[in-house]
A protein has these predicted regions:
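Substrate/ligand-engaging "lid" and interaction regions
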Residues: 1-277
Length: 277
């Protein structure tokens, strides 16, 4: 699809707005065993003009250890094999930061946009842990660990996003077919992930990011992003997750299951449930 995605905005009255999203310029497989693409990623990270990288990999993507406190086998493999054979997300990022370090130690902002509390802190801890383990085995220098430990050099801004983006809906795919848009069928991967050439999402949205970018940044405000300090990000996240939004959504989900509803949207047509909210 030439890196194009069809954005389908779901509106309260059941209608949709459609827009082609053309902001993706390049798609690269972030795996060290794919030599050409791995070298391309190294080239990108070595560029001193790179200002930020961002993630949406779910909270599980930052986890290094299981409930028993030991490293997952795939993480232990990354630790034992070093940067040139990185496989997991955290190892890949740490390896690429090492490439940036070797190319001149240019600053960079490493931004998690996953919806979990203190996401920047979680990301930083995981990257630092990987670097420290590699340092023990002689794969990376003491100076590299110092480089990514210094937030004046490599920052890990906190963020909070409120954007409901369900998995690709069959009803949306059907409506696109009826409108003459071809090849929109969702695909289910071997890991039960639903992907499609379109993204369906609700219209209401906001993204709040801690303004800590040591190498400068794009004018994210122009895209509607709220730039602020860490304390404000934390307060906004706490408001959403524990006070105003998520608890209400969870309550509706529980009552909806009891009353036989399949969709929150259908629940909102129920007068008593809408008054509960």
């Amino acid at each position: 699809y030439d890196n194009l995605v069809l954005g389908v905005t779901l509106k309260a009255d059941g209608s949709t707005d459609k827009k082609v999203i053309a902001s993706l310029t390049e798609a690269i497989k972030a795996q060290s065993n794919v030599e050409a693409e791995w070298n391309r990623l190294k080239e990108i990270f070595q560029n001193k003009d790179l200002q930020m990288i961002s993630f949406t990999i779910t909270e599980k993507g930052y986890a290094l250890k299981g409930a028993d406190g030991t490293y997952f086998p795939f993480i232990q493999s990354d630790i034992d094999n070093g940067p040139e054979k990185a496989g997991s997300a955290m190892a890949v990022v740490c390896a690429l930061l090492h490439e940036r370090f070797k190319a001149g130690k240019a600053p960079l902002a490493v931004v998690s946009m996953d919806n979990c509390s203190h996401n920047g802190e979680k990301l930083r801890n995981s990257i630092l842990t990987m670097a420290e383990e590699w340092n023990k085995k002689g794969f990376v220098e003491d100076e590299f660990v110092a480089y990514i430990s210094d937030e004046a050099q490599v920052s890990f801004p906190w963020s909070m996003i409120d954007k409901i983006t369900p998995r690709p809906a069959d009803t949306v795919a059907e409506s696109l077919k009826e409108a003459g848009v071809e090849d929109m069928d969702p695909v289910i991967t071997s890991k039960r992930t639903y992907i499609a050439p379109f993204v369906n999402a609700e219209g209401p949205q906001y993204l709040v990011i801690e303004d800590r970018f040591p190498n400068g940044r794009p004018q994210l405000e122009k895209a509607g992003v709220y730039m602020t300090d860490r304390d404000t990000v934390n307060k906004v996240e706490r408001m959403k997750v524990t006070t105003c939004l998520n608890p209400l959504h969870t309550a509706l989900a529980v009552y909806g299951c009891v009353l036989g509803y399949d969709l929150i949207a259908d629940e909102m047509k129920d007068k008593e449930l809408s008054e509960l909210e």
